[in-house]
């Protein structure tokens, strides 16, 4: 129990499961489970689960937080090369995302990044950084894509 936990399933509480399902399917992400209640997409090294926000609140025994707009968190898509940032932002735009920061030179690290929000305002950052970046190296190790 001294090693870090396996945390590779991201659950987003959503208001409209049908529109969110359609958005992520339009990105080309494969569905591994689908029902009227929730849907799970497979990503490289992780799963994305979309679950009704009110049911997520019940399951967590917490209050459902009302959406106020703005950004509070973002999930990062780790790009393998700089051009992949443009690729995913283009796919997201075609699927109906709002691109809030077009692909550009990153401000806070050496690399390239962009941001988009899905139809319900869940933010994603698409980022590329050189392999010698310590966060990139750790992300590759965490996904089982690096031996170092």
PLM feature segments, named:
Residues 119-124:
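Short, glycine-anchored, charge-dense loop/turn motifs used at functional sites
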Residues 11-13:
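Residues within well-ordered beta-strands of beta-sheet-rich folds
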Residues 15-30:
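Amphipathic alpha-helical segments
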Residues 1-9, 27-82, 86-117, 130-148:
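Vicinal oxygen chelate
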């Amino acid at each position: 129990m001294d090693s870090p936990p396996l945390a590779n399933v991201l659950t987003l509480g959503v208001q409209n499961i049908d529109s969110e399902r359609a958005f992520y399917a339009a990105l080309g992400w494969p569905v591994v489970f689908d029902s009227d209640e929730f849907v799970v997409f497979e990503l490289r090294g992780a799963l994305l689960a979309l679950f009704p926000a009110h049911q997520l609140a019940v399951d967590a025994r917490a209050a459902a937080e009302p959406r106020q707009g703005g950004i509070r968190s973002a999930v990062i898509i780790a790009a393998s090369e700089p051009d992949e940032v443009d690729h995913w932002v283009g796919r997201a735009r075609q699927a109906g995302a709002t691109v809030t920061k077009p692909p550009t030179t990153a401000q806070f690290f050496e690399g390239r990044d962009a941001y988009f929000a899905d139809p319900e305002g869940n933010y994603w950052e698409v980022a590329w950084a050189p392999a010698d970046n310590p966060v990139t190296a750790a992300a590759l190790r965490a996904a089982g894509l690096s031996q170092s």
